[in-house]
C-alpha cells in the first residue's frame, strides 16, 4: 500500500505549480489501474475480432465441391405392381453447391454417370443401362439443377429441374437433414445433406414394365457431402 501513502510535493523542487501537478498525476498511476486499462483494451480488441470473423463467415456465397466418395443418388422402384422394391444407387456423381447463409440462398448443380448404376445384380444393372430403361449409351448423363430454399436459418428444399433420358422435368427435393462442420481429417468445412424426391419415370420416356403392372413412381434419395473451396 506504499503507493497510497500521503506525499508532500514541493513546488520549488518541481519548478512550478504545473510541474508539481504532473508529478502528482504520475504518482497516481497505480499498477492496478494500468491492469484494468489493459484488460479493457483486450476485451474491445477481442470483440472486434469476433465480429469481423462472424461477418466474414456469412458474407457472400461460399462454393462447395461435391465429394464423389460420399455422394450417392439412390432410388427405389416398383417391381410387378408391389411384388417387391428394386433399390439401387449411382456410384459416380460430381457437382457444385453454392450457399449464402446470410442471404438465405443457394444453388445446386449435379451430374451423374448413368452407366455407374449399381443394384447388386449385374444382370439388373445391364438391363437398367440398356434402351429399356436409361439407354446409357445414348444418354450417358443425368443432370439436376436447382435453387435451395430456406425456412428461417434452415435449408428445407431444392426446387429445380431433372434431366434423364434426354427429357427435362421439374423436381422438388425435400431436405430431411443438413449439417456443416469442420472436417477432422480434411481440415476444411464440409456440409452434408439427406434429401428425398419422387417422380414418374414415364414422364421421362422410361415406361418399361407398365404393361406388366409396374408402378412408374420412382423415389429418389440423395445422400451427399460437399467440401468448401
Give residue spans per PLM region.
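Low-complexity, acidic/polar, glycine-enriched regions of mature
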Residues: 59-229
Amino acid at each position: 500500500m506504499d503507493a497510497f501513502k500521503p506525499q508532500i510535493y514541493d513546488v520549488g523542487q518541481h519548478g512550478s505549480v504545473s510541474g508539481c501537478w504532473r508529478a502528482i498525476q504520475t504518482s497516481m498511476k497505480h499498477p492496478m489501474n494500468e491492469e484494468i486499462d489493459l484488460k479493457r483494451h483486450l476485451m474491445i480488441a477481442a470483440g472486434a475480432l469476433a465480429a469481423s470473423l462472424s461477418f466474414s463467415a456469412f458474407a457472400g456465397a461460399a462454393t462447395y465441391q461435391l465429394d464423389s466418395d460420399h455422394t450417392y443418388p439412390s432410388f427405389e422402384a416398383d417391381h410387378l405392381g408391389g411384388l417387391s422394391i428394386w433399390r439401387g444407387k449411382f456410384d459416380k456423381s460430381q457437382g457444385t453447391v453454392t450457399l449464402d447463409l446470410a442471404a438465405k440462398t443457394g444453388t445446386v448443380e449435379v451430374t451423374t454417370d448413368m452407366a455407374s448404376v449399381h443394384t447388386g445384380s449385374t444382370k439388373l444393372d445391364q438391363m437398367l443401362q440398356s434402351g429399356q430403361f436409361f439407354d446409357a449409351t445414348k444418354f450417358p448423363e443425368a443432370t439436376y439443377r436447382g435453387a435451395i430454399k430456406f425456412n428461417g436459418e434452415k435449408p428445407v428444399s431444392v426446387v429445380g429441374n431433372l434431366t434423364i433420358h434426354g427429357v427435362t422435368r421439374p423436381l422438388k427435393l425435400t431436405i430431411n437433414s443438413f449439417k456443416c462442420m469442420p472436417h477432422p481429417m480434411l481440415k476444411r468445412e464440409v456440409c452434408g445433406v439427406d434429401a428425398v424426391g419422387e417422380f414418374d419415370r414415364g414422364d421421362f420416356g422410361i415406361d418399361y414394365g407398365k404393361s406388366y403392372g409396374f408402378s412408374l413412381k420412382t423415389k429418389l434419395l440423395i445422400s451427399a457431402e460437399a467440401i468448401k473451396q
